[in-house]
């Protein structure tokens, strides 16, 4: 008959296994895969109740994303030095021309439990082995648009050699921790659930819209 210590040990191991195997959103549909960008739909594992499909035009998406800036989240004392300079723009104009139409399509095709995941690619330090990636996801719920950034100009390997070698340079880096900002700041709010979100409908009422010229927005 198992002792009390054995039962406690088994329960502890089971809890660690369950924690280590936490479910993550998973890909359901690839909407676009190219040299400069990729956009996929991801299924949430917890009820999300997004307002998808959402009707947003590419110029509206561009205006929204143009307002975001970003800074890597630092621990003290590095945070003091980081806060002395303004955050960087999240997207350059050429990136907006690529990603805005794809995100507009993604939001129109996503379901209520799906988010739209995006990746932007640029050549890495060694073009044959790595590329620079900016990635994250967007979703809409009611009056709010949610944006999360996972990688910001991160060097990510293209090829995988031996995933079991602990110092293998081909393993992708862990997602980063970032602070997002938006201008005008009055639209970047804390919603009822405690998450940062953009009151995008209110913002779009007075936002300047830039319509891409034909042939500009080629991924």
Question: Where are the regions that the model predicts?
Answer:
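Polybasic, proline/glycine-rich intrinsically disordered low-complexity segments
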Residues: 154-218
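A mature extracytoplasmic/lumenal domain signature
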Residues: 120-124, 134-136, 144, 149-153, ...
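Sec-dependent bacterial lipoprotein signal peptides
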Residues: 1-19
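Extracellular/lumenal regions of secretory-pathway proteins
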Residues: 76-105
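Acidic/histidine-rich, surface-exposed loop or edge segments in extracytoplasmic proteins
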Residues: 37-48, 60-87
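Short acidic/polar, Gly/Pro-enriched loop/turn segments located at secondary-structure boundaries
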Residues: 53-57
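Mid-length scaffold segments of soluble, non-membrane domains
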Residues: 96-132, 136-142
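Bacterial Sec signal peptide processing site at the extreme N-terminus
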Residues: 15-39
């Amino acid at each position: 008959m198992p002792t009390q210590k054995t039962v406690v040990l088994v329960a502890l191991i089971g809890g660690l296994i369950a924690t280590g195997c936490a479910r993550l959103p998973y890909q359901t549909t690839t909407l676009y895969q190219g040299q400069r960008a990729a956009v996929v739909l991801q299924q949430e594992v917890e009820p999300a109740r997004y307002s998808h499909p959402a009707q947003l035009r590419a110029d509206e998406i561009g205006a929204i994303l143009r307002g975001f800036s970003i800074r890597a989240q630092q621990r003290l004392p590095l945070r003091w030095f980081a806060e002395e300079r303004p955050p960087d723009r999240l997207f350059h104009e050429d990136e907006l021309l690529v990603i805005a139409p794809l995100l507009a399509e993604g939001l129109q095709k996503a379901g209520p439990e799906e988010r739209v995941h995006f990746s932007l690619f640029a050549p890495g330090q060694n073009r044959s082995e790595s590329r620079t990636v900016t990635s994250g996801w967007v979703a809409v719920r009611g009056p709010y648009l949610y944006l999360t950034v996972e990688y910001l100009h991160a060097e990510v390997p293209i090829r995988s050699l031996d995933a079991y070698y602990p110092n293998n340079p081909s393993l992708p880096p862990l997602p980063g921790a970032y602070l997002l900002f938006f201008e005008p700041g009055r639209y970047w709010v804390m919603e009822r659930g405690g998450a940062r979100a953009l009151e995008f409908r209110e913002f779009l009422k007075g936002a300047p819209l830039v319509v891409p010229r034909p042939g500009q927005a080629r991924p």
